[in-house]
Regions:
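Conserved MFS/SLC helix-loop-helix module at the cytosolic interface between two early adjacent transmembrane helices
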Residues: 72-111
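Cytoplasmic helix-loop-helix junction between adjacent transmembrane helices
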Residues: 116-154
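Helix-breaking motifs and short loop linkers at transmembrane-helix boundaries and internal kinks
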Residues: 53, 85, 106-112, 249, ...
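Helix-to-loop junctions at the C-terminal end of transmembrane segments
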Residues: 74-85, 269-281, 365
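Helix-loop-helix hairpin linking two adjacent transmembrane segments in secondary transporters
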Residues: 108, 112, 140-195, 239, ...
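A membrane-interface helix-boundary motif in multi-pass transporters
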Residues: 171-183, 363-384
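Paired small-residue
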Residues: 96-103, 111-120, 307-315
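C-terminal transmembrane helical hairpin of 12-TM major facilitator-type secondary transporters
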Residues: 283-327
């Protein structure tokens, strides 16, 4: 009898683990769709501009509009839906995403396309914020960062596979075909989430409690860790194409292949960053941020050599996304009584870091600071160095909280 009971318990545990894994893959598919729609416009700017009769710079504002939609939508959507069960919220977000991309595919003019991009962007921060909470609740406590990393793998795969395939599709059959493809992927993700993601009870916290948590200094520091720790990546990465072409001497046509190397790096970094964060959160975060700082600083030198540049771009990818699971897990730990809004705001902080980093790099180039473009990578390392200082502060606050 004891053997039968143990066998049944083992079967149930295996079934539970399988269900959790499938649920994580469902979240990954949703993340893939959202990541694809975020980045795809970069590869289709000429086609969009020509079809809608606007300039390339004006078409480029579709990227800015999406980023602003993410930053604004993250807190607004989460606050407005705080009483909604988390699975229902995910499905609601996917419906908005599907509608936004279908509208983009049908857009008769630039204005409608911009509105469609913003509508799709409103779902971004909340999906990754709520998805992080659900992913963390699907697994034992010691595996939470790894679960978050699995979900974010969808975002990294969108860079490696989704964007190149979507760009090819758009160039071959028109940019609207790409948005129709993303709409279909979103619909499939919706069905998969319905079938595989279990109903997860919403936190018992009220809106007042959710907002109250945001008054904590530890939450502010966690957000600043994300803004500056990740912002340095985009100080350099935003201008990676001119660095590769104008400084290293690669041909413009080779840039896309080099970016695939970066994409492989961020996938590896995301997975192993999650594993390391589950073992030792702050030591791993500080170690990866230190690696990121060193790699960025050296990039100003290695950019003069093609072989060294390839190695640098790959390691940069590993270090860049190696921080993501740990930064997200730290926010969940810091605001564990009301994680949904805090987690979502941390996604907005990643995007704020992207915008801040791009702005800093642009200022360096525009002003010709220390030679302009060649100085961008080492200036980026100073941004991540600030992130390290905030991470040390965050570690100190966590120790103080543990003692109290």
């Amino acid at each position: 009898m004891q053997f039968d009971h143990a066998a049944r318990h083992s079967d149930l545990s295996a079934s539970s683990r399988k269900g959790s894994t499938l649920a994580l893959y469902a979240l990954t598919l949703g993340a893939f769709a959202i990541g694809m729609t975020e980045f795809i416009i970069m590869g289709l700017l000429p086609e969009v501009a020509a079809d809608l009769h606007v300039s390339i710079p004006l078409a480029g504002l579709l990227i800015t509009g999406y980023a602003l939609g993410v930053a604004a939508g993250a807190p607004v959507i989460t606050i407005a839906t705080h009483k909604m069960p988390r699975k229902a919220l995910l499905l609601f977000l996917m419906i908005l995403f599907i509608v936004g991309n279908a509208l983009a595919a049908l857009a008769p003019n630039y204005t409608v396309l911009m509105l469609a991009r913003i509508l799709a962007a409103l779902t971004h921060g909340s999906f990754f914020g709520v998805g992080s909470v659900i992913a963390a609740e699907l697994v034992p406590k010691e595996k939470r960062a790894g679960a978050i990393a699995i979900m974010f793998t969808g975002l990294t795969l969108a860079n490696i596979l989704g964007v190149p395939i979507g760009t090819f599709l758009g160039q071959a059959y028109g940019w609207r075909s790409t948005f129709w493809a993303i709409t279909v992927i979103g619909a499939i993700a919706f069905v998969v989430i319905v079938l595989l993601v279990p109903k997860v009870a919403s936190a018992a916290s009220s809106l007042r409690q959710e907002l109250g948590v945001l008054k904590r200094p530890a939450v502010h520091v966690a957000l600043l860790m994300t803004v500056f720790g990740f912002g340095g990546v985009f100080t350099a990465f935003t201008y990676i194409a001119p660095i590769l072409v104008d400084i290293t001497g690669f041909s413009p046509g080779s840039v896309s292949y080099i970016l695939v190397l970066f994409g492989v790096g961020i996938t590896i970094g995301n997975i192993y960053g999650g594993k390391l964060a589950d073992r030792k959160l702050f030591p791993s975060l500080l170690g990866i941020l230190a690696l990121l700082t060193v790699v960025l600083a050296l990039f100003s030198l290695t950019a003069l050599s093609k072989p060294l540049t390839l190695v640098t771009v790959f390691v940069l990818g590993i270090a860049a996304f190696g921080t993501v699971p740990g930064l997200q897990l730290h926010m969940l730990n810091t605001a564990k009584e009301a994680p949904t809004l805090a987690s979502t705001l941390n996604i907005a902080a990643f995007n704020l870091g992207n915008a801040l980093g791009a702005y800093i790099g642009g200022v360096v180039i525009e002003l010709g600071f220390a030679g302009g473009l060649p100085a961008v990578p080492w200036v980026a390392s100073l941004t991540t160095l600030i992130g390290i200082l905030f991470t040390l502060w965050g570690a100190r606050l966590q120790k103080q909280a543990a003692r109290s």
